[in-house]
Amino acid sequence: MIDKMTQLVEDSLEEAKELAIAHRNYQLDIPHLWAVLVKPDQFAFQFYQSLEINTNQLIEIINKEIDKIPVLSSTEKSSYARLYSQRLKNLLDDAHQEMIDLKDQVLTVEHLILALFNQQRNPITVFLLEQGLNKEKLYQKMHRIRKGKPAISSSQETIYDALEKYAVNLNQRALDEPVNKIIGRQDEMNDIIRILSRKNKNNAVLVGHSGVGKTAIIEGFVQRLVKNQVPKNLQGKVIYSLDIGALLAGTKYRGEFEERFKALLNDIIDSNGQIILFIDEIHSIVSAGRTEGSVDAASILKPLLARGKIRIIGSTTHAEYRESIEYDRALERRFQRILVHEPDLDYTMEILKGLKPIYENFHGVRLEEDGLEAAASLSKRYISDRFLPDKALDLIDEACAAKRLASHAYPVQMTNLSQQLISEKIRLLRLTDSDTDDKFKLNNHLEQLEEQKSQLLANWQRERELLDQVQELRSHLTALEEQANLALENNQVADYVRLEDEEIRKCHQKMTALEKERLDSQKIINVTVTREDIAAVVERLTGIKVQGVMENERDRLLHLEELLHQKIVGQDQAVQKVSQAIIRSRAGIQNPKRPIGSFLFLGPTGVGKTALAKRLAEVLFGSELEMVRLDMSEYMEKHAVSRLVGPPPGYVGYEEGGQLTEAVRQRLYSIVLLDEIEKAHPDVFNTLLQVLDEGRLTDSKGRTIDFKNTILIMTSNIGSTNILQSLQDSGCITSEVRYKVLDELNHSFRPEFLNRIDETVLFNALSEKDMTGVVKVMVSDLQARLLEQDIHLTLTESVYILLAKEGFDAAFGARPMQRTIMQKLENPLALYLIQNQKNKEKETFVTVSVKDKKLKFTFS
């Protein structure tokens, strides 16, 4: 048997055996092997196709030959494909002889294809001869793809035409496909040209954050190459982009990746400097193939780069450059780094304006100038974990897609008319024969509605047709403008003038006429993308309210203090200051570099500090659960502080991130409540300094978390003793007591922490008069819970006064009142409900009054 064959030949023989077993054939024969070899993704299939063989007919003949092979009646699989047929043995022997004659070290699929021609009567050979194929053509083809080199590798078939298999010709793609217009970045392109023109170290690597336009710079450079807008030494050069996925695909055995990569690099070397390789995400190839006892791609590249055999352009991010390339000093020296910075807002606007026609043509919409400005400014402000211009383009794409979807849907008026028609038809069917007048009126009304609906549908369809025609003309206009620009670049002035003065002008006139016809008719479809559409996308992606204040929200903001007072009693100053911060934020005049508001609530326990934060979350977000709450008593130890931003690398929980940073990252627009802040370890305050001042915090993974759209509320019991004493003595918080509380605060917290807080609010201790309001708030919650069980609870005013008096405790605020209500109200009601389970389906009315200084319950 053959000493050594390629992995593809071995695998093909194994697969052919499985095919023979599946067909219950006694012997493994040539048709089984050829059925495997000519699968569409196999080397032989591509080999035959390149020789213009009709592969479909070839596969049909192979399948017919398999059907002719005798089938065993035995059901024992061990009896199938036990032997090689004589003609398959002869084929392998002839292939081995071809290998020897060609001075190859391994038997390849090519040897099998050659050996098949020694069996002139084989139907497969007969067909190939009829197609004009012979050994001479096969030898010529082998010499071309091997470039005169012998077969020495066990993965020989995978390294032929490596450049075409594992890389993409960017020059050809730029000529064949329409490419996006590249706006700006001329400095970076000139840097690439300068580096490629050097004698030594003529390899460039673009380093920048994801989304800043590294790949776009290469596309722009390729466009300049294709148009010969480069120095003479670079004219005629071809850029190939490495397809890392194709290079790694199917590399099951050690060394396969290296052989493919070396073959690709050899093709580049053979081009004598005409080919430049572009490696996107170059960090992924540097360590590719790295296993124990083998070399990686960097080890293959370094000698070639050092000798100047190849030229490479790479792109990567700052972090990956540091980890993969900068880490390997020898590799780093071979590259010249080009830093690609994030564009500023003005530069981003230039890019967006340049790409505007592309998005308009694709989606069939119109992009307003304010929409572009909103995409740049809002993405910069509210999407902090990505970079311009990519994030701005994403907003535009998303808004255009949403507008396009809405423009193809039936208008709301038509939906309303359809629903109205159904309602009227139901009414008509329910009328009796005696309701003659009503039937007559309804039938007339139905006819009117049907006519309105038909007219609306016709108008909508006509407008839709006009919009489709406008979009076709716009696409045609873009193509004409590209032709005109190309003519101007090629100095074809006559063609340029003809296109500009005739075809482009006619196209503009047709578009203007169609737009006028649409505007003159009843305009139903909206295809204009404005600032509001972009803001809606930002709000949907981040949860941050950036749209203009709507009418219902305006009412809520104007009455925010009243809404908060519904649940918060006796804390006018605190409610006022928090409300003002929210209104400043929604009006858009607060400092955009700081949180919406940062507050330190001081006061005795049970006076409403935490309750105000909960109520604020309920009013703004619809639920008090929509709040990030951290109990700072859990952060008393020094080692617990790291849980806020996440443990450092190597520690348990590193992948989960920090409790504060992760919560805010998922809810960018939220209320952050740090309860009982004085109990936290002093190092916590160092962490919070950056949040209070700059509105950001870096977690353990190096990600910057944006706190600019949060309301930070910290509560503390510091000074509560002085406040209670003041109330007992004078009934209010005096200026002397306020001074004492602030003095105690200064002793507890550092000045740099206190100076960064927007407002320090002293909560009043609740008086007996305030307690009546607290009782009403708590009872209203109880009434809402009972109403779910069809129980209506009513209390007389004297009950509220009695409960307030019995539950009042100046030292502990409203918390004792919860126990009083539980004992005086909830317990008797619970007992009644248990005793009357049978009447649960009936509505129950409960009235509570006072008799002899005790509560009296009346059930009905």
Curated annotation (Swiss-Prot):
Region (NBD1): 161-342
Subcellular location: Cytoplasm
Recorded GO MF terms: ATP binding; ATP hydrolysis activity
Coiled-coil residue windows: 393-522
Region called NBD2, residue ranges: 553-765
InterPro entries: AAA+_ATPase, ATPase_AAA_core, Clp_ATPase_C, Clp_N_dom_sf, Clp_R_dom, ClpA/B, ClpA/B_CS1, ClpA/B_CS2
Name by which UniProt lists this protein: Chaperone protein ClpB
Protein's organism: Streptococcus mutans serotype c (strain ATCC 700610 / UA159)
Gene: clpB
